[in-house]
């Protein structure tokens, strides 16, 4: 794909349609200008633009989103980095737009994570649920959220590959252990 020097007219039109009547013209122009400045620092393609548009269009409150992006420029940097580098991480934010406000918190992104962290938080996540289906769904959501964090540690914070691999291993081990325990209990309940 070829690098885009400017945002497409289609992108701008769709953002204007989404934000119409919710933010001032000046705020919208500033927002688009900030996006364009940040995209100039990356190898931004049509695919990247499409990813970015999907993320923005799926925000619950576009006025709040634009206002926050203008107040905290690192949010636009995270958006561009993510949409430019990963379709998978983009899909996570499209499916769960609320994760964006979680992940932009520097304390969340920079938090040191290890096997103990994943194990304890995964146990807390599934504890309130009774059925195996709801527990598995909670595990799925936890996995998506943590994959987003690990992915951004890689592409945004530029952490070492060794650490990223370690985080993914910790996450996989924790998920495997809790799933094994759930399945084991389910089988015991069925045969007792």
Task: Report residues per predicted region.
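Non-catalytic regulatory/linker segments of enzymes
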Residues: 1-192
